[in-house]
Amino acid sequence: MAKQIALPRSQTSPLFQWRAYYEMTKPKVVALMLLTVLVGMCLAVPGTVPLVPLIAGMAGIGMMAGSAAAFNHLIDRRIDGLMARTYNRPLPKGRISIIKAISFASILGTLGFIILYALVNPLTAWLTFASLIGYAVVYTAYLKRATPQNIVVGGLAGAMPPLLGWTAVTGEFHGNALLLVIIIFAWTPPHFWALAIHRKAEYAKVDIPMLPVTHGVEFTKTCIFLYTVLLAIACLLPVLVGMCGPVYLVSSTLLSAGFIYKAWQLKFHETPGLAMNVFKFSIYHLMLLFIALLVDHYLWV
């Protein structure tokens, strides 16, 4: 186990401590996730989303997502300290003790669950709890270290937010919400595999069997390209069932074409930094795609 690091007094101040807790929630990841939750809520109703499910749902789901991220930090603290991308995280640096981190993650998740159960509905509370377990336990603690298909199988937990938003408003499952889940499920592998190519040596160093480590970079590039094509097809499903109109169709087509082009470049060109470019583009792809869903919905209601 890594030795606890002695920190300057400024780094043990309450303000610095709260910044460390905030960092443990992976705020940028949660923000993108909450965008997909919001879109799920808005697409579930023809008009304005009711205020209580909107506020309580976003708060509760966000808190439980932050809790899952904090548990991820806890479980991965050893390997995080050995990887250049993550060695500055609060736990490897000793900015937060393990006991405090466990308490923080547990309290945050519990409060989020209570908010969802009491103010939204039990279905959303339990689905969000299942997503937390899927990400923090099934993926982080087991799949990540067990199989190169970790991100494919474990990606289902990360694809749930639009469904959570939908059930928060309606209290029931709907096929249209599952189409949004399919989109994120197909988006997840090329997103993470691009990062895994860029960080291949680091994953190999800590014995994490990411696809580039176990099957090679070229095979992973091929998989990324094939998954971007699969994603492009998945992005058309909302149009095919009449859920979306021309604004989304044009937007998703352009975004899919851009993602496929980036993946093609990655596969057939050896330009340095292309894998990281694909990773960054994938983030904008998902963000803009869900914004297009939102705009299209309110233009064509």
Swiss-Prot record:
This is Protoheme IX farnesyltransferase. It comes from the Bacteria. InterPro entries: Protohaem_IX_farnesylTrfase, UbiA_prenyltransferase, UbiA_prenylTrfase_CS, UbiA_sf. The keyword Nucleotide-binding does not apply. Carbon 2 of the heme B porphyrin ring is defined according to the Fischer nomenclature. It catalyses: heme b + (2E,6E)-farnesyl diphosphate + H2O = Fe(II)-heme o + diphosphate. It is an enzyme of class 2 (transferase). Its EC number is 2.5.1.141.
